[in-house]
Design a protein with these regions (language model features):
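Short beta-strand elements of ligand-binding domains
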Residues: 1-2, 49-51
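Metal-dependent enolase-superfamily TIM-barrel catalytic cores that perform enediolate-based chemistry
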Residues: 1-43
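Shared catalytic-loop signature of beta/alpha-barrel
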Residues: 23, 31-48, 54-151, 155
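Catalytic-core signal marking the mid-to-C-terminal active-site face
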Residues: 156, 164-176
Length: 176
């Protein structure tokens, strides 16, 4: 159940109490880590931190507060592939499950998430979410990332395994 920071603490506790026999993960129910910390012990469901996971320091803080039972993490939110790799290592050291998600990009971020997801300990890996099925076309028409029967093949080849058609990037905002 993804609260997207929209629940008050009162409503988050109420939902968890009224649905205590229904198994689910409560993803980012409240707006702040402080709000989540104030109710965490009164909930019947594990909490995944999502929108508040903006950097490694915040991830470590949420783990230290004991309020992160797992994470829904986007590569772009945490700061790119290097930070995502560091984040994943922290989660592995603490046995915390997590995702490796796309933040509504195209083939480039899809390939990055797919490659990164393939490196996560399978016991802790909650999956990779890609926006691919909501986006028309591909930057790389030959090797573009595709979700088939719920699975994603890790791209082969150099780098991320895709070769974007440079023609799709025609209208430069700036050239340096």
């Amino acid at each position: 159940v993804d609260g997207n920071r929209g629940f008050t603490t009162k409503d988050a506790v109420r939902l968890s109490n009224e649905c205590q026999h229904i198994p689910f993960v409560f993803e980012q129910p409240c707006n702040s880590l402080e709000e989540i910390a104030s109710i965490h012990q009164r909930l019947h469901h594990p909490i995944y931190i999502d929108e508040n996971g903006i950097d490694i320091a915040t991830v470590i803080r949420s783990i230290s507060l004991g309020i992160a039972d797992g994470f829904g993490m986007k590569v772009t939110r945490i700061g790119g592939l290097h930070q995502m790799s560091l984040f994943s290592g922290i989660c592995e050291a603490r046995s915390l499950p997590h995702t490796c998600d796309d933040a509504w990009g195209g083939d480039i971020i899809n390939a990055a998430c797919t490659h990164m997801g393939a490196t996560i300990n399978s016991k802790l890996f909650e999956g990779t979410w890609l926006a691919q099925s909501y986006i028309e076309g591909h930057y790389d028409s030959k090797n573009g990332i595709k979700i088939e029967n719920g699975h994603i093949k890790v791209p082969k080849g150099k780098g991320l395994g895709i070769v974007p058609d440079e023609g799709v990037f025609r209208n430069e905002v700036a050239i340096y």
